[in-house]
Each structure stands twice: as structure tokens, then as C-alpha cells.
Design a protein with these regions (language model features):
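A short, Lys/Arg-rich alpha-helix, primarily the initiator
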Residues: 1-21
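The alpha-helix within a helix-turn-helix
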Residues: 15, 26, 56
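Short alpha-helical DNA-recognition segment
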Residues: 19-38
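The DNA-recognition helices of helix-turn-helix-type DNA-binding domains
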Residues: 32, 43, 70-74
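Residues within the helices of the helix-turn-helix
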Residues: 12, 23, 53, 64
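DNA major-groove recognition helix of helix-turn-helix
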Residues: 15, 40, 51
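Short, basic-rich loop-to-helix N-cap that marks the start of a DNA-contacting helix
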Residues: 43-54
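Short, charged recognition helix plus adjacent turn
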Residues: 13, 38, 67-80
């Protein structure tokens, strides 16, 4: 699995846990829809740390909380 896919899955899972829509997150952090769509899409070719940090803050989480998930512990995680 690629890192960008892992980040997108983690964001999706957190949104579901928080009963929050992607649209609501976009509005809360003033992120353009196309930016979020690219990050969450299958054609995402990489993740931008600034964008990920913006999302983490919008989810009211720490960086440690966000990355503390088994999905990021996969030794075969591809850095894209």
C-alpha cells in the first residue's frame, strides 16, 4: 500500500468515527474541494505534509494521534 492511500484511509476512518463529512472538514479548514478530492482519490501520487497537517488540525488531533494506527506500521508501506 502507498503512503498516500494509507493517509486517505486514515482520514476516511476518522471522519466516520467523528460522524463528520469530508465537506465539513473542507469548510472547517478552508481547504479547496479539489485539494481534498486529490488527497482522497485513487490517483493521488503523493501527500503534501502541509496539507496533512492542516487536516490533522481540522480533526482536532495531534500528529501522534493521527499516525498512531496500524495502517502506518506496515513495513511494506510504499513512500510515494
Amino acid at each position: 500500500m502507498k503512503l498516500s492511500t494509507a493517509v486517505a484511509l486514515r482520514v476516511s476512518n476518522i471522519l466516520r468515527e467523528k460522524n463528520m463529512s469530508q465537506y465539513r472538514l473542507e469548510k472547517d479548514i478552508a481547504m479547496p474541494h479539489n485539494t481534498m478530492k486529490t488527497l482522497m482519490g485513487e490517483r493521488n501520487k503523493g501527500v503534501n505534509l502541509k496539507t496533512v497537517m492542516q487536516i490533522i488540525r481540522g480533526l482536532n488531533m495531534t500528529t501522534s494521534e493521527f499516525f498512531n494506527d496500524p495502517i502506518f506500521e506496515n513495513p511494506d508501506l510504499e513512500i510515494d
